[in-house]
Amino acid sequence: MRSVSVSFVLTLLAVVGCSTATTSSLTGSGGTPEGGGGSGGGAIAGAGGSTGTGGIAGTPGRGGSGGANGSGGATGGATASGGATGTGGAPGSGGARASGGSTGTGGSKGTGGQAGAGGLAGTGGSAGAAGASGDGCPTGGAVTTNVTINNTGPWNDTTGKHIQAHGGGFIKVCDTWYWFGEDKTLNTNGTGNFHAISCYASKDLVTWEHRNSVVTTSTNPVLNNPALIIERPKVIYNASTKLYVMWAHWDMESCSGASGSYCDSEAVVFTSPTVDGNYTYVNHFQPDGNGSRDCTLWQEPDGTAYFVSTGGPGGNAAGDFHDTEVHQLSSDYLTVQSTTKIWASDTREAYAFWKVGGKYYGVSSAQTGWAPNEAAYLTSTGTIAGPWNNSFTPLGANNSTWSSQPTYVIPIVGSQTTTYIYAGDIWNSNNLSLSTYLWLPLTFDGTTWHLSYAAQWSINLMTGVLTTN
């Protein structure tokens, strides 16, 4: 946050919008999840073997040795040990609940046993929880449906610690949401200097496990600078390079000796082959020679990606950042290919985008440092680069958006409808480590989007339907 304008006190986030079946990064599409399996549906050629016919269909298994075609295993003990009578493996012992489903723990050589009389119904497979779907995601297993978001209780992780993911973004990989954000545990005195970027994981948007500090001051020597600021990290997946790519705002705490100013006004890029692994520093720079501060990412279903940020003059001087710029990224997502100015002289920051049908919506806040203000949105019937209408529509969220600032819009794509969740930061300017969060469902009346406060509200993650609001 804390974008600085000449018009505002120098006291002081971005959106990845994905939503596809696979990585669904809330920024619009794209990612293909890690891991892999072929066509799933149950066993994917599990240890039930490829030739043994005794297994009938091995329905229960998701790769268990009663799997696809009998429990004899891939070679099943010559070619017939999984044979017609299912002699390939003592009651499907080739892997009771084959994990992952790609080859089944029954093994490739019919480890289910030599002349076991089992087979027949693939009893070893029991109720295996995960084969692999065609997109590489596990299938089956327990699914949480109705969940309640509590805006009044503590936002803690599974260890009881306060969630440190400020200015964050979200990406969904298979059945898991990942929440990236600024770790401000050590920012107890109101300064926003960089310490780490956190990654949390959840299957229900309520129970969050801290997976990793994916970027730290030890990631690269260039990050070990007490004046460094990194804000609003967002992550999308590049299906071509098979890398998760993170963009964020890069800056320095002081300019020409003036504490509290942004002087670099740049973007920074990191990559990782796994969503929650250690990310590698790539570069920091001014996109197309333009200054860049608060930012987010957007990804189209065809994989085209955009970096959106508060733009201003190039160079290393603190200046007025009144414009909003959309930077189309290169095919590897590591550099900028072209730049379009979409909201000129509107002095906005803290962007979050979502798309419904053929319309794009972009919510943002005014630039008032750490102090909250009323969030408002614009509409584009063209592309993320516009044309946008020129009149901001308030979300009706009182004059401070209940003391929050936008950071992301999370789409919950269900079997009946898609619900869009406004995710905001509630900043504590005196002790940033105590900053917290506000999540509310966006509602549409056919003409206008609205945000209404609820201390608690519930949603069915399978159908996408709000069950209470």
Regions found by a protein language model. Give the residues of each.
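Carbohydrate-active catalytic/glycan-binding domains of CAZyme proteins
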Residues: 136-469
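Terminal low-complexity, poorly structured segments
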Residues: 6-9, 22, 116, 145, ...
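Sec-dependent bacterial lipoprotein signal peptides
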Residues: 1-17
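Arginine residue identity/basic-tract feature
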Residues: 2, 28, 55, 61-62, ...
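Ser/Thr-rich, Pro/Gly/Ala-heavy low-complexity intrinsically disordered linkers and tails
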Residues: 13-139
